[in-house]
């Protein structure tokens, strides 16, 4: 399903910056499927739209609580066991400058996360108290480097994602 976004809304969001631009596109996509991506409505979106929603979810979780939180909250299979990293790498291949390298490096980060998810996912998704959840960060320091790498490169990654979307806007929405 391709959401329709007024051209002036896109212009206004782009003028506010990368985050506002991505938020507008992501919210329009999510609204087109009643606000939440799930197995029942995923087929209504194309691979590009699903990848943007995946990036949005990853960004929110990792910026809030790292990859441990992302996995604990049940997003591990969606992020790591689907072609998210591959699509991000392909987006990067279409870019000629440093942004392509940024997305290529980001895809490698996701593949590293997948290895850790496959190794520790069962333990990290167990129900637990808040104190037990906080203890996971001490028990699994392997995720620290992933968190640090994402946070250090987040602005560049987000800018590259936004640039790709801007260059392929018709894959994400219809502008009226």
Language-model features, listed with the residues they occupy:
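A conserved position within tetratricopeptide repeats
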Residues: 92-95
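Extended, alpha-helix-rich binding/interface surfaces that flank or overlap catalytic cores
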Residues: 2-85, 97-176
């Amino acid at each position: 399903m391709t959401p329709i976004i007024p051209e002036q809304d896109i212009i206004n969001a782009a003028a506010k910056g990368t985050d506002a631009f991505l938020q507008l596109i992501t919210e329009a996509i999510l609204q087109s499927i009643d606000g939440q991506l799930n197995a029942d409505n995923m087929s209504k979106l194309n691979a590009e739209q699903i990848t943007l929603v995946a990036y949005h979810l990853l960004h929110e979780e990792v910026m809030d609580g790292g990859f441990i939180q992302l996995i604990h909250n049940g997003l591990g299979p969606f992020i790591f066991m689907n072609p998210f990293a591959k699509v991000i790498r392909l987006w990067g291949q279409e870019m000629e400058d440093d942004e392509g390298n940024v997305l290529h490096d980001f895809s490698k980060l996701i593949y590293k996360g997948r290895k850790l998810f496959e190794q520790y996912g069962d333990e990290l998704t167990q129900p637990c108290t808040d104190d037990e959840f906080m203890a996971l960060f001490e028990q699994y320091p392997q995720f620290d480097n992933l968190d640090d790498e994402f946070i250090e490169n987040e602005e560049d990654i987000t800018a590259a994602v936004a640039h790709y979307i801007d260059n392929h806007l018709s894959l994400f929405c219809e502008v009226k």
